[in-house]
């Protein structure tokens, strides 16, 4: 049992929230709370849509004799599918190609929202990370509510397929996404420089 992400370089993503936080603290982000709210609404809604796609896909792959393809069946199958690495070893090759393109399209949609929401690249990057973080957290929360998976944060998941499959325990993307969202919020806060005390008139006499 490995506790960290694979391939090894995926673990470097844990540095992202800390790096962007210190970068943004040098010059706070110029993103309004209203922008973050609506970008967050999009991300949460999109996260549920993403989870729904996975639910439908599992249901379709689980349509076998004795299985009705219902939500209850999907919930029953979810754990065993991941424990057996079903999504990598037995996933139909034709659907794997579609899934890879779908992942790329997902990133393009999140990037497009960020590009349209801000004019400066640093603010666009912040909106992208904010949207991605909320999308990712909502994705796992929606799967948990609808299918009962993940049963714990230690469950193994396939995060992405581009350029190669990324695998990690669920706690890894949830933690990184949570810290990234926090970094964006803190990155909006203005710096408060220490002001030198002003001498009183009596001291100047």
Model-based region annotation:
Residues 23-29, 186-197:
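Membrane-interface capping segments at transmembrane-helix boundaries
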Residues 10-11, 35-39, 100-103, 124, ...:
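Residue-level signature of transmembrane alpha-helical entry/exit and packing/kink sites
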Residues 28-44, 117-134, 197-204:
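Interfacial segments of alpha-helical transmembrane regions
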Residues 54-100, 152-170, 174, 178:
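Extracytosolic (periplasmic/ER-lumenal) interhelical loops and adjacent juxtamembrane/interface segments
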Residues 22-37, 53-64:
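Membrane-interface helix-loop junction between the first two transmembrane segments
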Residues 11-21, 105-114, 168-187:
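Hydrophobic cores of alpha-helical transmembrane segments in multi-pass inner/ER membrane proteins
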Residues 47-60, 133-151:
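Transmembrane alpha-helix/helix-exit interface in multi-pass inner-membrane proteins
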Residues 1-15, 93-96:
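Hydrophobic transmembrane alpha-helical segments in integral membrane proteins
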């Amino acid at each position: 049992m490995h506790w960290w992400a694979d391939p090894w370089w995926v673990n470097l993503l844990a540095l992202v929230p800390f790096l962007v936080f210190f970068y943004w603290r040098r010059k706070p982000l110029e993103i309004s709370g209203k922008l973050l709210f609506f970008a967050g609404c999009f991300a949460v809604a999109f996260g549920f849509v993403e989870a729904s796609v996975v639910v439908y896909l599992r249901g379709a792959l689980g349509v076998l004799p004795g299985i009705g393809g219902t939500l209850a069946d999907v919930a029953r199958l979810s754990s065993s599918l991941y424990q057996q690495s079903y999504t990598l070893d037995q996933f139909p090759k034709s659907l794997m190609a579609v899934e890879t393109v779908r992942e790329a399209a997902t990133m393009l949609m999140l990037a497009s929202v960020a590009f349209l929401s801000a004019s400066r690249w640093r603010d666009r990057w912040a909106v992208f990370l904010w949207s991605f973080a909320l999308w990712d957290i909502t994705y796992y929360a929606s799967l948990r509510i609808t299918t009962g998976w993940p049963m714990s944060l230690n469950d193994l998941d396939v995060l992405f397929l581009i350029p190669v499959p990324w695998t990690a325990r669920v706690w890894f993307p949830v933690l990184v996404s949570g810290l990234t969202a926090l970094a964006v919020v803190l990155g909006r806060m203005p710096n408060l420089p220490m002001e030198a005390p002003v001498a009183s008139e009596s001291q100047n006499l």
